[in-house]
């Protein structure tokens, strides 16, 4: 779910080129996405953070009787704070829009691995990008959070 139709088109093209039998629903507004979440059960959801109130959708997906694994996607809200909030609200992964070309292996990991393994693998894939974008010390302001999170995901099996 993204407010930019061109991003949805790229996601659809990337996913369907590797998984042509995959069924995709798309929404360009918070209201459309909320209606879809209320009406259907999904194996996975991808929410843009900024334009479609992605954090609100993430909370809704997590409160369902059978929570939906969610990947948060962003360009405008790309920050250590939004990554932290995504984790706190239960996202299974966080992907910068600049990495859309790598979305399929990323989604395969989310569908295949347990929470800790997904985050370990996801952070390993984007750590260089984050260090380049935010600087090598981006975890420093919330050092205790990141230390606790890294311990949590290290203790979970694959």
Language model regions located:
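Two-component/phosphorelay signaling modules centered on CheY-like receiver
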Residues: 5-25
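Conserved phosphotransfer cores of two-component systems
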Residues: 38-40, 61-68, 89
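Two-component signal transduction core modules
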Residues: 45, 70, 94-95
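C-terminal output/effector regions of signal-responsive regulators
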Residues: 112-158
């Amino acid at each position: 779910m993204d407010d930019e139709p061109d991003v949805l088109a790229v996601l659809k093209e990337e996913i369907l080129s590797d998984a042509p039998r995959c069924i995709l629903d798309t929404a360009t507004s918070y209201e459309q996405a909320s209606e879809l979440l209320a009406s259907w059960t999904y194996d996975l959801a991808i929410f843009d953070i900024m334009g479609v109130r992605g954090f609100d959708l993430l909370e809704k997906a997590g409160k369902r009787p059978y929570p939906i694994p969610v990947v948060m996607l962003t360009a405008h809200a790309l920050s250590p704070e939004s990554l932290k909030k995504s984790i706190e609200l239960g996202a299974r992964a966080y992907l910068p829009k600049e990495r859309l070309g790598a979305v399929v292996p990323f989604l395969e990991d989310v569908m295949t691995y347990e929470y800790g393994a997904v985050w370990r693998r996801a952070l390993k894939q984007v750590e260089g990008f984050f260090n380049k974008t935010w600087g090598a010390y981006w975890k420093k302001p919330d050092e205790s959070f990141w230390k606790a999170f890294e311990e949590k995901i290290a203790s979970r099996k694959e």
